[in-house]
Amino acid sequence: MTPLHPARSTLHRRSVLAALLSVAAGVARAGDDGEPAGPLRIVVAYPPGGVSDAIARALAAELAPRLGVPVQVENRPGAGGAIALRSLARAKADGRLLVFSAVTPLALDPQLRVGPAAEGIRGGPPPAVAPVAGVMLTPSLLVGTPAFRGRSVADLLAIARERPGGLRWATSGIATTGHLVLEQIRVAGGIVVTHIPYKGGGQQLSDALAGQFELLSTNVGALQLRYVRSGRFKALAVGAPQRVPQLPDVPTLAELGFPQANLASRFGLFAPAGTPPARLRRLNGAVDAALQQPAIRGALLEAGSLPMGGSAEAFADEIARSNAEIARAWPSASRMPVN
């Protein structure tokens, strides 16, 4: 190895020392202003390969420079998002761990709720979590796979009545919005179907394309839209306040006579309860700013979702609205079994 020139060696030592002092100063500043040192972790409550995972990773890339720390993303799927959310109860409330999830488990998972079921489900966020920011509102989508020989919800009902239990209906898991949609149509339509709960993500779509079941309750997303446009999926209905622009010919479930099943999914970021208010405000501001960026907004709109944003208080209000919708759709939802 060629030895360093003395002058270069001195410069090298000074550069290393300056870098170390800079890091130390950064850590000191983090402690002085109440900001935790170290990377931020975002746990996505769903498997890799889905819309939620893609949006969470795009958001992480925008948050890192705004917060001045690395942002790491990992996946912890299961129980429709409840497993990741439950982990917040065991986490240190320093604002270094966030969970990206739909809000549905906050109403449906008994481990996240406290108090009387009716009171809890109609209220806002449960005490186990602190809302940070709303990220997106995603319409639900009911599709027929290549194995489905009908072309409409009317056909679905007719086939199910002809062959009780013969239609296999997949969702992203028990106690998800898709499961609620299934149950509402099942009860209102007086039919029997076979529920196949997944953990969400790419495997569910792969099996759908392979025709391993006839029906899929999912969310509007870029891949789903691609498969509908190519004819591989038959779009039967959407759950949204009005028809979605990407699928203007597909009716809402309310139009088809299933208003209680006309549900969309709200997704956002959550921190452990007890996270310092100043840290929550900092995180909320960074998320809200990131959602204004063209890259993020474009990715959301391409996926068929609407950006949310706004304050943590506004997100808490959205959670309360979602809980009220679920309470109306399924009065016994808080007693619903969760994986």
Kindly give the residue locations of the regions a language model identified:
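An extracytoplasmic/periplasmic, membrane-proximal ligand-sensing/linker region
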Residues: 37-40, 279-339
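N-terminal secretory signal peptides
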Residues: 1-11, 15-25
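Hinge/capping helix and adjacent helix->loop/strand transition within the periplasmic-binding protein
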Residues: 90-96, 110-203, 253, 266-299
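N-terminal (or domain-start) structured segment
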Residues: 30-127, 166, 174, 191-217, ...
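C-terminal lobe and pocket-closing loops
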Residues: 223-291, 324, 338-339
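Beta->alpha turn/N-cap motifs
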Residues: 99-105, 171, 201, 217-224, ...
